[in-house]
C-alpha cells in the first residue's frame, strides 16, 4: 500500500509537470517555498471534448495585465524580504507561482502540484528517486483571486492544513472555519461591502434597484447579504439576475431585456470583471444608457469594463475599492521587467508580447528582424500560436515599457497589489516568529517551538492565526478568529480623463467599518460625476417622493417601495418627505391646511367679548335693572293698596329671587372654570325654585281664602306670614338638598371637548351627572306645574286679586320656555349649550317679572286713581255679589222642586231687574245709618264675642214671608232681600230653604271679612235684617297691617232683593253696576 501511495504521488507530480510547461509558471528556489495563484489570464478557450482522443489541457486566453502586476508584487515582496537582514536572516524564500486563468480547474491543477510536492517531501522519496535536485515543500500559498476559485482551493489545501492567504477573495462564506480550516485573507469580508452598498443607496434616497450577481461563491453570497441589508432599509429590488462569463448569448440577452424594461435606474453588481464583460458588451451594443452601476470591489477597477468605448454606458459608476497602500520601490521594479532579464518569471515573455503586440522568438539572444512573421512551430517548442500572436511582428527586445499605457503600470492606486504584498509579509512574519521562538514560550505542546529548518505547513498556520505585526505603513496587522483582516473601503467614481480619454477612478469618499453605525459612510457629492456627465443625483425610486403633508400609501400587489402619496388626514401631519405614516397632532393642536405641521386649536366658549355673549349679558343686566327698579317702586309705594294686596313681604322675596335668576345667567358666560361650573346650575336651580315657591304660596293662599266655606281660626293661624315663609323655605330646601347631593357625588367641572369639531376646542362644563341635572330641572318644573294649577283655579278672583291670571300666563311662558329648552339643549353643542340655557333663564325670568309685576307698576306709576281703597272694595264687593247672585238664581229651582214634592202650588218664575241709582233715589228704602262709626277691623276676641244685630225693617210686607240680610260697611249698608212664594203651612220648609241659601251667601261674605267666621243666617216668617260691621277689605295675602278708615259719608254699593224675587244694586255708582253686569 505504501508503494501504491508513492506511485500516486509520483504520477500526480509527473502529470502536473507536463501540464505546466516552463512558460506557464514563475519559480525560484529557496530554503522555504511559497506558492502563488494568480489570474494571468481571464479565462480558458472553450473546446468540444468529444473524447475521441486523449483530452488536452485547455488553453488560457485574454491576458490580464493586473494579474501579472499582482504576481510581480509577490516576487517583489519575496526579494525584498530576502535582501532584508532583519527578517529571516540567513534564510531564503523561494516561490512557485501558477496561472489560475480565473477558473477553478486551472487553480486545482496548480493546487495539486503543491499538495503532491508536499506529500512527496513528507514521504522522503529522494533515496528512491533519481532526482537531480530536491524541491522543498510549499509551506503556504498566496491566492487566489476570485472567491469561487479560492473556495475550491481552500477545500483542498485545508485537508493538509496548508495555510492559504488570499489577497482578493472576499466572499463571506470563506469565513466559515469549520469548512475552510486553513484559509486567511488580507481583504475585508464582503459582509461589510454589502452593508456599505446598502448605506450608499440609503444615502442617496434610492429605494428601487436591480441586482446582478456572478453565479459563483463570490456573487451569490454577496448579493444575498445585500438583500438582507436592503430589506432592513426598505429598499426594494425590482429584478435579480445571475450571470457568468460562460453564459451563452441567449441568457445574456434575456438579462439585458430585463434591465432595459426595468424602471430601476440603479443596478447593484456583485461580480468580477470577466463575468460581467459579456453583459456590458451587449448593453453597449443596444446603447442602453442612463443607468447607475454600483460596483463591488471585484470589478470596480476592472480593466475589462473600464474602457473608453464603454463609458457612455458605465460612466458615473460608483464602486468600492480597497484602501490603497504604499509599496516603496515597486514602481521601479515594475519598470525593470523584461523577458530576457526575468529568468525566473515564465510569464514575462507573454506579458511582453501582449504589451507591445509583437511576437518574441523563443531562445533569441538579440533583436529579430522586424516584419518577420512566424507561421510554423518554433524549434524546441510544441505550443501552437493562437490567433492573437500568429501574425504579429517579431519583438526587438528593446521596447520601452514606459512608452505604452497599460493597467500594468497603474501604480498610483495599489489595492490588490498591496494586499499581495501584505500577504507575503504576513507569512514571512509568521516564519520570523518561528525563527525567533524561545523554548518554553512556543505555541505548541509544553511551549515548544517549531524547527525553522524543518518547518511544516500546519506549524506556519498556527503562527499565522496568532500573528501580530506592524506593516510598513504603520498599521497593525492581525487576523481575527475567522481569519479575516478588517479594513476600510474607498468609494471611487468613474470619470473620463480629459487628457487621454481613458477612464480614471476618482476617490469621492470612504467607508470606515470601525465607526459607529450611521457614521461609517462619507461621500463628497460635489466630486461625483453621474451618467451623462450630470452633477444631479439620479432618481431611482418606484414612486416619486411624497412631500411633507402626505404619507406613503401601499399599492396592492406592488412592492412596498411602490406607493401612492396619500394626504394626511385632518388632525395628522408629516413634516418630512416619504413619511411612512402621519403623526397625530397633540390634543390641543390641529394640522394646518397643508398638513405639514400642527397649529394650536381655536378655543371656543361663550365669551364676554363676542357679540352673542355681549347681547346675552346686556339682557341679563337689563333684567337685573328692571327687577331692581320694580323692587324700588314697591318699597317706595309699600303702603298703597295694590302693594298691600300683593303681600309685600313675599313680593320682596319674589323680586329678590328674580334678581338671583337674572344674575345666575351670568355664570354661563365666560370661560368655564371648575368653580363656575359647580356654581351655575345650583344658582340657577335654587333661584328659580325660590321664585316659584313664592308664587305658589301666594296663589294657594288666595285660593284657599276666597273658596273657604268656613274661614275659621284654623285658616287664620296656618296662613299667617310665618307659615308662608316656612313653606317657601321648605320648597327651596328640597332643591338645596338636590344640589348638595349633586356636588358631593358627581360635581360638575370644566371640560375641554376635542371631539365636537376637529379644529376647535370647546371649553364646556361637564355636568357630572345628567340625572342630577334632570332632577334639578324636574323639581323646578314640578313646582311650576303645581303653581300653574292653583293659578288657573284662581283666575276668576276679584280684579284686585287677579294677578293669578298673570301668574297663569307666566307659568305658561315658563313651561313653553323649558319645554323648548330640552330639545334645544340636546341638539346643540359647544358654547351654544350655555347660550341656550342662558336664553331659557332670561326668557323665563322676564316672563315672570313682566306678568306678575309690570301691570302693578303701571297702575302705581301711571294710574294712581286705581290704587285706592275704594277700587279695591268695589272689586271685592263685585266678586261677592256675583257669587251671591249665582247662588240666588240657582235656589228657586231647588225650592220649586221641593214644593212640588209637598203638593203645594208652583211658584212664579223669578224675574230680576238691575238698576243703579244714587242712595237718595233707591227704589227700596235703605236702613238707617249708624250714628257711631264702627271700627274697620276687630280683634279676634271681639269678633268672637260680637253678636249679629238685628234691626227692624223700615218697610213691612206681611203678605210675604221675608228673610232679609243687611251687611253694613263703615261707609254704607248692603241689604240682601230674599223672598219666596211659599204657603204659610210650609214655613218650616221655608226656614230650611233659607238656611241652605244662607250658606251660598256666606261665600260672598267671606270676601268681606275673611278673619271673621259668619254665623248661619237667622230667618223668621217675618222679614229680618242682619248687620255685620265692616272689618276692612284687604288683599288676600296680607295679614299683618291695619286698613285705612274711610269717611262714612260715602255710600257703598248694595244688593237688594225685591218681593218679586228680583235684586237691585243700591249705591256705589254706575261703574260698579257696569262691572257687576259685565261679570
Swiss-Prot record:
Keyword Lipoprotein: no
Binding site for phosphate: 66-70, 415-417
Stretches the record annotates as Arginine-rich retention motif: 890-898
Tissues expressing this chain: Epidermis, kidney and cartilage.
Topology with respect to the bilayer: Multi-pass membrane protein
Bias type Low complexity, positions: 900-918, 932-961
Leader sequence segment: 1-19
Ligand-binding 1 (LB1) as annotated region, ranges: 22-188
Comp. bias intervals (Basic and acidic residues): 919-931
UniProt cross-references to InterPro entries, sorted A to Z: ANF_lig-bd_rcpt, GPCR_3, GPCR_3_9-Cys_dom, GPCR_3_9-Cys_sf, GPCR_3_C, GPCR_3_Ca_sens_rcpt-rel, GPCR_3_CS, Peripla_BP_I
GO biological process: adenylate cyclase-inhibiting G protein-coupled receptor signaling pathway; bile acid secretion; branching morphogenesis of an epithelial tube; calcium ion import; cellular response to glucose stimulus; cellular response to hepatocyte growth factor stimulus; cellular response to hypoxia; cellular response to low-density lipoprotein particle stimulus
Regulation: In resting state, adopts an open conformation, anion-binding promoting the inactive configuration. Upon aromatic amino acid-binding, the groove in the extracellular venus flytrap module is closed, thereby inducing the formation of a novel homodimer interface between subunits. Calcium ions stabilize the active state by enhancing homodimer interactions between membrane-proximal domains to fully activate the receptor. Upon activation, the homodimer adopts an asymmetric configuration of the 7-transmembrane region that primes one protomer for G-protein coupling.
PTM comment text: Phosphorylation at Thr-888 by PKC impairs coupling with G(q)/G(11) G-proteins, while it does not affect G(i)/G(o)-coupling. Phosphorylation at Ser-899 by PKA promote plasma membrane localization.
Binding of L-tryptophan, residues: 147, 168, 170, 297
Location of the region described as Intracellular loop 2 (ICL2) in the Swiss-Prot/TrEMBL record: 699-722
Region named Cysteine-rich (CR): 542-612
Modified sites of kind Phosphothreonine: 888
Renumbered residue ranges of the record's region C-terminus: 855-1079
Region Interaction with RNF19A: start-end pairs: 880-900
Residues engaged in binding Ca(2+): 81, 84, 87-88, 100, 145, 170, 188, 190, 231, 234, 297, 489, 557
Record-annotated disulphide pairs: 60-101, 236-561, 358-395, 437-449, 542-562, 546-565, 568-582, 585-598
Membrane side Cytoplasmic: residue ranges: 637-648, 699-722, 790-805, 855-1079
GO molecular function term, any single one: G protein-coupled receptor activity
Subcellular location field: Cell membrane
Family: Belongs to the G-protein coupled receptor 3 family.
Name of the protein in question: Extracellular calcium-sensing receptor
Gene name as annotated: Casr
Amino acid at each position: 500500500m505504501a508503494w501504491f501511495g508513492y506511485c500516486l504521488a509520483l504520477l500526480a507530480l509527473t502529470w502536473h509537470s507536463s501540464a505546466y510547461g516552463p512558460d506557464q509558471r514563475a519559480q525560484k528556489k529557496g530554503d522555504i517555498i511559497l506558492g502563488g495563484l494568480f489570474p494571468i489570464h481571464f479565462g480558458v478557450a472553450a473546446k468540444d471534448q468529444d473524447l475521441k482522443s486523449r483530452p488536452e489541457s485547455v488553453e488560457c486566453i485574454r491576458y490580464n495585465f493586473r494579474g501579472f502586476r499582482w504576481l510581480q508584487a509577490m516576487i517583489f515582496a519575496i526579494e525584498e524580504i530576502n535582501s532584508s537582514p532583519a527578517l529571516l536572516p540567513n534564510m531564503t524564500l523561494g516561490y512557485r507561482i501558477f496561472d489560475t486563468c480565473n477558473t477553478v480547474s486551472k487553480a486545482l491543477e496548480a493546487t495539486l502540484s503543491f499538495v503532491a510536492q508536499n506529500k512527496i517531501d513528507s514521504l522522503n522519496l529522494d533515496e528512491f528517486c533519481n532526482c537531480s535536485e530536491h524541491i522543498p515543500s510549499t509551506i503556504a500559498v498566496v491566492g487566489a483571486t476570485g472567491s469561487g476559485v479560492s473556495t475550491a482551493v481552500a477545500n483542498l489545501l485545508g485537508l493538509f492544513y496548508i495555510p492559504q492567504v488570499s489577497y482578493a477573495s472576499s466572499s463571506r462564506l470563506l469565513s466559515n472555519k469549520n469548512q475552510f480550516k486553513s484559509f486567511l485573507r488580507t481583504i475585508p469580508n464582503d459582509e461589510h461591502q454589502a452593508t456599505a452598498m446598502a448605506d450608499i443607496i440609503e444615502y442617496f434616497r434610492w429605494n428601487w434597484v436591480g441586482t446582478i450577481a456572478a453565479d459563483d461563491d463570490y456573487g451569490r453570497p454577496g448579493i444575498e447579504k445585500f438583500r438582507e441589508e436592503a430589506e432592513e432599509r426598505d429598499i426594494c429590488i425590482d429584478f435579480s439576475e445571475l450571470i457568468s462569463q460562460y453564459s451563452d448569448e441567449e441568457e445574456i440577452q434575456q438579462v439585458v431585456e430585463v434591465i432595459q424594461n426595468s424602471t430601476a435606474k440603479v443596478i447593484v453588481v456583485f461580480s468580477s470583471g470577466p463575468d460581467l464583460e459579456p453583459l456590458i458588451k451587449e448593453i453597449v451594443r443596444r446603447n442602453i444608457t442612463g443607468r447607475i452601476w454600483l460596483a463591488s470591489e471585484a470589478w470596480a477597477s476592472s480593466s475589462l469594463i473600464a474602457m473608453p468605448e464603454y463609458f457612455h454606458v458605465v460612466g458615473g459608476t460608483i464602486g468600492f475599492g480597497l484602501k490603497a497602500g504604499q509599496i516603496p520601490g515597486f514602481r521601479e521594479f515594475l519598470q525593470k521587467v523584461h523577458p530576457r532579464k526575468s529568468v525566473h518569471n515564465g510569464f514575462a515573455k507573454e506579458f511582453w508580447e501582449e504589451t507591445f503586440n509583437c511576437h518574441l522568438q523563443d531562445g533569441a539572444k538579440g533583436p529579430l528582424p522586424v516584419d518577420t512573421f512566424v507561421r510554423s512551430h518554433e524549434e524546441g517548442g510544441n505550443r501552437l500560436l493562437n490567433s492573437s500572436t500568429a501574425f504579429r511582428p517579431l519583438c526587438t527586445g528593446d521596447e520601452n515599457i514606459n512608452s505604452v499605457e497599460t493597467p500594468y503600470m497603474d501604480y498610483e492606486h495599489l489595492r490588490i497589489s498591496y494586499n499581495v504584498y501584505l500577504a507575503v509579509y504576513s507569512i514571512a512574519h509568521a516564519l520570523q516568529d518561528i525563527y525567533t521562538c524561545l523554548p518554553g514560550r512556543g505555541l505548541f505542546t509544553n511551549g515548544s517551538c517549531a524547527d525553522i529548518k524543518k518547518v511544516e505547513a500546519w506549524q506556519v498556520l498556527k503562527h499565522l492565526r496568532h500573528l501580530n505585526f506592524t506593516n510598513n505603513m504603520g498599521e497593525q496587522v492581525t487576523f481575527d478568529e475567522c481569519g479575516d483582516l478588517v479594513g476600510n473601503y474607498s468609494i471611487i467614481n468613474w470619470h473620463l480623463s480629459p487628457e487621454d480619454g481613458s477612464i480614471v477612478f476618482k476617490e469621492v469618499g470612504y467607508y470606515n467599518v470601525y465607526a459607529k453605525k450611521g457614521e461609517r459612510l462619507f461621500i463628497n457629492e460635489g466630486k461625483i460625476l453621474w451618467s451623462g456627465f450630470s452633477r444631479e443625483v439620479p432618481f431611482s425610486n418606484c414612486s416619486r417622493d411624497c412631500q411633507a403633508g402626505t404619507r406613503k400609501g401601499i399599492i396592492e400587489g406592488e412592492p412596498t417601495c411602490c406607493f401612492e402619496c396619500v394626504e394626511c388626514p385632518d388632525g395628522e401631519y408629516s413634516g418630512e418627505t416619504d413619511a411612512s405614516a402621519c403623526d397625530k397632532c397633540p390634543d390641543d393642536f390641529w394640522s394646518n391646511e397643508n398638513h405639514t405641521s400642527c397649529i394650536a386649536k381655536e378655543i371656543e366658549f361663550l365669551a364676554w367679548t363676542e357679540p352673542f355673549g355681549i347681547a346675552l349679558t346686556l339682557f341679563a343686566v337689563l333684567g337685573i335693572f328692571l327687577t331692581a327698579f320694580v323692587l324700588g317702586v314697591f318699597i317706595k309705594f309699600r303702603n298703597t293698596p295694590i302693594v298691600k294686596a300683593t303681600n309685600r313681604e313675599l313680593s320682596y322675596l319674589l323680586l329678590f329671587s328674580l334678581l338671583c335668576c337674572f344674575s345666575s345667567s351670568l355664570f354661563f358666560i365666560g370661560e368655564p372654570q371648575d368653580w363656575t361650573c359647580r356654581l351655575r346650575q345650583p344658582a340657577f336651580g335654587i333661584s328659580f325654585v325660590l321664585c316659584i315657591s313664592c308664587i305658589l304660596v301666594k296663589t294657594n293662599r288666595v285660593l284657599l281664602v276666597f273658596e273657604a266655606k268656613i274661614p275659621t281660626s284654623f285658616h287664620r293661624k296656618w296662613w299667617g306670614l310665618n307659615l308662608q315663609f316656612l313653606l317657601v323655605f321648605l320648597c327651596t330646601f328640597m332643591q338645596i338638598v338636590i344640589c348638595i347631593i349633586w356636588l358631593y357625588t358627581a360635581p360638575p367641572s370644566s371640560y375641554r371637548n376635542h371631539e365636537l369639531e376637529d379644529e376647535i376646542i370647546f371649553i364646556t362644563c361637564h355636568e357630572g351627572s345628567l340625572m342630577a341635572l334632570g332632577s334639578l330641572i324636574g323639581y323646578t318644573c314640578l313646582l311650576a306645574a303645581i303653581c300653574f294649577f292653583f293659578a288657573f283655579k284662581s283666575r276668576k278672583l276679584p280684579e284686585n286679586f287677579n294677578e293669578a291670571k298673570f301668574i297663569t300666563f307666566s307659568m305658561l311662558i315658563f313651561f313653553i320656555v323649558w319645554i323648548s329648552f330640552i330639545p334645544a339643549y340636546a341638539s346643540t353643542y359647544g358654547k351654544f349649550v350655555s347660550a341656550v340655557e342662558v336664553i331659557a333663564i332670561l326668557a323665563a325670568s322676564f316672563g315672570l317679572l313682566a306678568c306678575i309685576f309690570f301691570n302693578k307698576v303701571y297702575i302705581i306709576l301711571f294710574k294712581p286713581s286705581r290704587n285706592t281703597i275704594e277700587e279695591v272694595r268695589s272689586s271685592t264687593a263685585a266678586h261677592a255679589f256675583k257669587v251671591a247672585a249665582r247662588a240666588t238664581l240657582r235656589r228657586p229651582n231647588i225650592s220649586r222642586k221641593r214644593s212640588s214634592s209637598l203638593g203645594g202650588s208652583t211658584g212664579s218664575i223669578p224675574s230680576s231687574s238691575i238698576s243703579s241709582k244714587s242712595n237718595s233715589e233707591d227704589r227700596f228704602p235703605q236702613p238707617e245709618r249708624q250714628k257711631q262709626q264702627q271700627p274697620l277691623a276687630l280683634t279676634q276676641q271681639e269678633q268672637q264675642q260680637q253678636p249679629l244685630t238685628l234691626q227692624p225693617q223700615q218697610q213691612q210686607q206681611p203678605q210675604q214671608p221675608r228673610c232679609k240680610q243687611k251687611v253694613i260697611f263703615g261707609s254704607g249698608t248692603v241689604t240682601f232681600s230674599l223672598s219666596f212664594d211659599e204657603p204659610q203651612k210650609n214655613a218650616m220648609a221655608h226656614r230650611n230653604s233659607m238656611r241652605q241659601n244662607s250658606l251660598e251667601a256666606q261665600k260672598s261674605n267671606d270676601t268681606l271679612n275673611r278673619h271673621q267666621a259668619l254665623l248661619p243666617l237667622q230667618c223668621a216668617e217675618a222679614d229680618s235684617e242682619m248687620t255685620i260691621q265692616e272689618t276692612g277689605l284687604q288683599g288676600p295675602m296680607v295679614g299683618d297691617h291695619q286698613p285705612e278708615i274711610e269717611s262714612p259719608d260715602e255710600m257703598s254699593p248694595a244688593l237688594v232683593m225685591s218681593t218679586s224675587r228680583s235684586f237691585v244694586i243700591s249705591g256705589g255708582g254706575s261703574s260698579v253696576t257696569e262691572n257687576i253686569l259685565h261679570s
